[in-house]
Amino acid sequence: MSVASDSPVHSSSSSDDLAAFLDAELDSASDASSGPSEEEEAEDDVESGLKRQKLEHLEEASSSKGECEHPGSFGNMCFVCGQKLEETGVSFRYIHKEMRLNEDEISRLRDSDSRFLQRQRKLYLVLDLDHTLLNTTILRDLKPEEEYLKSHTHSLQDGCNVSGGSLFLLEFMQMMTKLRPFVHSFLKEASEMFVMYIYTMGDRNYARQMAKLLDPKGEYFGDRVISRDDGTVRHEKSLDVVLGQESAVLILDDTENAWPKHKDNLIVIERYHFFSSSCRQFDHRYKSLSELKSDESEPDGALATVLKVLKQAHALFFENVDEGISNRDVRLMLKQVRKEILKGCKIVFSRVFPTKAKPEDHPLWKMAEELGATCATEVDASVTHVVAMDVGTEKARWAVREKKYVVHRGWIDAANYLWMKQPEENFGLEQLKKQLTEEE
């Protein structure tokens, strides 16, 4: 494991104690493979290195006027002064299983690294795995209609990297994984703008195996692979363990509720359902892409669309850099991009909300406004769209007479997920009626 070469902290120019220590003591493992014996060797290297570092820092600490603030530890030992400590601070197990940092040190590292990366015109991007970059199924969950896939896979043996291909059979895990179309181009282009993390609710072994499929040469993620075992809150994802300023972090995930504290950083992507088990998991009745022997479009799919959004937010952040960027917030840039999606649209809703509810409090109303639309409760000549579920409502009939667009709520949902205004003709009420009939 090479924290020195791969962690964003060590891409910075700071010469602080943590960076110096990790550079010196973990670099010896940077060229090793990921086999179990090598992990044990890396642990031994850290332990012996810790003893050497302890002697150096003890001498330095003894001549200092102030006491050591114990910025972090390996195991129960401060990596600055060597003093034994109680288990405190935030664990950074994905970097090293014994590593913990206190809040002040985390804040200092984030400040230092963010300043350095911004000089390189880079921000941070945290990426979910399942249904975002790829789709995985257990082999026993394959339908008979999907058995043909087994003859189209690349095989990933335990501990071996594979490059090329998009469908992988992981027999040692009894799994099959399909990479989302455009993912390799997405990662390559995104890496030029962002330091990237993987953050998954899967376990550590699964996370690392998926990282090998996505990044077989170790060019994009290094050790920045965070699993559910590394988080600070169960069943939630948080930026607590990401060493980047929240104002410089964007997140790509298919599940909004996974990030309750960081929704302003989040880009929600349409879920990738390649396998039938994925559709069943979310109670979708339509056939999966594998059953249809189809797939998303490379140039026009979800990842290609999101890449455009990332480029827009990145460009806005670094616009007019001569004016200074230290106080800029990429979350505001993301909101600015969203505001352009339905800009110029004025929407009236017809029997979409519960009768006694305040329309302006409904999530769909708020979503439309976040996308740049103006919402109203009454129709007039300036209205461009009526969102309804029944063409027989008074407002829907008015829209037809006045040659305004009548669409169902899916038009707004699609704009939200796809980050672009959608053709109204694809979301008419006749299409909705047909869809509901097919699902019955």
Swiss-Prot record:
Residues 118-292 form the FCP1 homology domain. Residues 337-429 form the BRCT domain. SUPFAM superfamilies: BRCT domain (SSF52113), HAD-like (SSF56784). Its cofactor is Mg(2+); Co(2+); Mn(2+). It is found in: Nucleus. Pfam families: BRCT (PF00533), NIF (PF03031). Keywords: Hydrolase, Metal-binding, Nucleus, Repressor, RNA-binding, Transcription, Transcription regulation. Induction: By NaCl. GO terms for biological process: response to salt stress. Its main location: nucleus. CDD domains: BRCT_CTDP1, HAD_FCP1-like. This is RNA polymerase II C-terminal domain phosphatase-like 4. It comes from Arabidopsis thaliana.
